[in-house]
């Protein structure tokens, strides 16, 4: 068994070796250090949870270094996706959860929102820019998601529920 003083020396030596090893790797042309951060939220299907989850995601987005303008659009898209999951997907059934996963990488921000509802086909959603839909009080959420994000796609899980995946690429 190591004596505590010996283990401190061993640890500090290991730290130095690790720093040198990382530096050596970074100097190689085929290696780079990539930081990927993720966060996951699970929330009940209540209207109040939409604001709480959107605020948590906005904090993550702001810490990720996304521009203020992009962060505004991401916030709108996230709020709409979560609201759709809570209201339309899970139909405000508090026994059903909405899962939100956010992943920040050097080239993009990816957000997934999954509900436990029946699912739907986004192709069947009316175009909110058509004259007959302009004055409707709802129906713009998917339009906002598609316009504020670079990629938006939906999938239905075999066990039920709908997932929306939204990606915002970073501008270098």
Language-model-detected regions and their locations in the chain:
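Conserved polar catalytic motif of the HATPase_c/GHKL fold
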Residues: 80, 84
């Amino acid at each position: 068994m190591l004596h505590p003083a010996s283990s401190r020396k061993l640890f500090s030596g290991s730290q130095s070796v690790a720093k040198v090893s990382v530096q050596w790797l970074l100097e190689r042309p085929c290696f780079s250090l990539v930081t990927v951060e993720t966060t996951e939220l699970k929330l009940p299907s209540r209207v109040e949870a939409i604001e709480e989850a959107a605020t948590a995601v906005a904090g993550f987005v702001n810490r990720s270094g996304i521009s203020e303008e992009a962060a505004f659009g991401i916030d709108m898209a996230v709020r709409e996706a979560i609201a759709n999951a809570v209201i339309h997907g899970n139909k405000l059934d508090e026994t059903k959860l909405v899962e939100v996963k956010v992943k920040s990488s050097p080239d993009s921000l990816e957000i997934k929102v999954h509900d436990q509802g029946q699912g739907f086909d986004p192709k069947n959603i009316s175009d909110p820019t058509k004259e007959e839909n302009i004055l409707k009080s709802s129906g713009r959420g998917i339009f906002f998601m598609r316009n504020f994000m670079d990629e938006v796609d939906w999938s239905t899980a075999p066990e039920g529920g709908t997932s929306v995946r939204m990606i915002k690429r970073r501008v270098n």
